[in-house]
A protein has these predicted regions:
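Short coil/turn motifs at helix boundaries and re-entrant loops, enriched in small/polar
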Residues: 16
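Terminal amphipathic alpha-helical/low-complexity segments used for targeting or macromolecular assembly
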Residues: 2-13, 24-217
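Structural signal for interior beta-strand "rungs" in well-ordered beta-sheet cores
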Residues: 222-344
């Protein structure tokens, strides 16, 4: 339904133009103009203030390093595109569970091919955007940068078969380690720990290829989605599982062996930073724990510093661990002796 505003040359304002149009009276039109003028005057009344604030916000003094300017119009990495990369990787790694839900034996290769093609395109664009961000747009040959990005994206896609094999061990470990899990299908569909591990393995592979910024964006999307924070720089073996998962933190230089299981709230972190002569934290040094094979760490335990947790060790919940743990050792919290039990009448 539309409104017809009559031309000033038409004397009869009650004239209908069609069955579905209504005439606005001159009095109503005048009221609209008055409202518009009032709103415009309120804006103009503060125009000087807005201009002054805009000048301050755009000044180099205010911006400092909080602004990224592209001289050639190159785009920066986009959150929506990074999410699409994750979705495409999941669809390729777990066809039918993610992405197209009508995959069958006859169209499986077709759907994987379509998703791989789309993945290469989007990933190439985002890798190039990440390189631009890292170079602060100083590159003079953007076409060469795009070619390098396309090559890197192809190298990543070549890593997907091995990544799927490793993820299969993670799914199996998660299923076998949780008596509440009904099937591996349930693990793939539902478990936040596995989703975080998938994102980690994608991000870690990209990081090993030298891709800037994108790996961290992928891991932080998993952090937001699951509450599990795994830095893409961590090294994690096969048959890895995270049960429940909320609050798990794995630092950038952590090394985790095979068949390791973490429960919710576990932190594999650093004790403190070393500082240089200017009192700035020294980055890039190993500062997180090394976890051996077949280790279980229960909920809300913090393992801090570059310490070694031996093979087959079991660490109980709510413990602060800052020293090495030997092979086959079990750490538990001392039994509380200050519990008051009240008898009910």
């Amino acid at each position: 339904m539309a409104f017809y505003i009559p031309d000033k040359t038409i004397p009869n304002f009650s004239k209908q133009k069609s069955q579905h149009q209504f005439v606005l009276s001159p009095k109503f039109i005048l009221s609209l103009q008055k409202i518009s003028n009032i709103l415009m005057n309120k804006t103009y009344r503060h125009e000087d203030k807005l201009k002054a604030v805009t000048s301050v916000l755009a000044s180099k003094t205010s911006l400092g390093t909080m602004c990224h300017l592209c001289r050639g119009g190159e785009s920066l990495p986009a959150q929506s595109s990074i999410q699409e990369i994750i979705d495409l990787c999941r669809a390729v790694l777990f066809p039918g569970f993610y992405g197209n839900d009508d995959v069958n034996i006859y169209n499986l290769e077709y759907f994987i091919g379509i998703n791989c093609g789309r993945l290469h395109k989007v990933l190439s664009e985002q890798i190039a955007a990440g390189m631009v961000l890292g170079n602060d747009c100083d590159t003079t040959d953007y076409a060469a940068l795009e070619r390098d990005a396309a090559t890197t994206a192809a190298q990543f896609i070549e890593m997907l078969p091995e990544m799927r094999r490793v993820l299969h061990t993670d799914v199996h470990a998660t299923y076998c380690g949780d008596p509440a899990a009904v099937s591996t299908e349930e693990v793939i569909f539902c478990y936040p720990g596995l989703k975080a591990i998938i994102n980690y393995r994608i991000a870690h592979a990209l990081l090993t290829l030298g891709v800037p910024i994108i790996p961290r964006m992928i891991s932080e999307i998993a952090h937001s989605e699951t509450g599990i924070d795994i830095h893409p720089g961590a090294t994690i073996g096969e048959h890895f599982s995270i049960d429940h998962g909320t609050g798990v933190v794995i630092g950038a230089t952590a090394i985790i062996g095979n068949n390791v299981k973490l429960y919710q709230g576990v932190t594999l972190g650093a004790k403190s930073f070393d500082y240089d002569e200017d009192n700035n934290p020294i980055k890039g040094i190993p500062r997180h724990p090394i976890i051996g094979d077949n280790v279980v760490i229960y909920s809300n335990t913090s393992v801090l510093g570059r310490i070694h947790i031996g093979n087959n060790a079991v660490i109980g919940g709510n413990i602060w661990v800052t020293d090495d743990v030997a092979d086959n050792e079990k750490l538990t919290q001392a039994k509380a002796d200050n519990i008051l039990r009240l008898k009910q009448d």
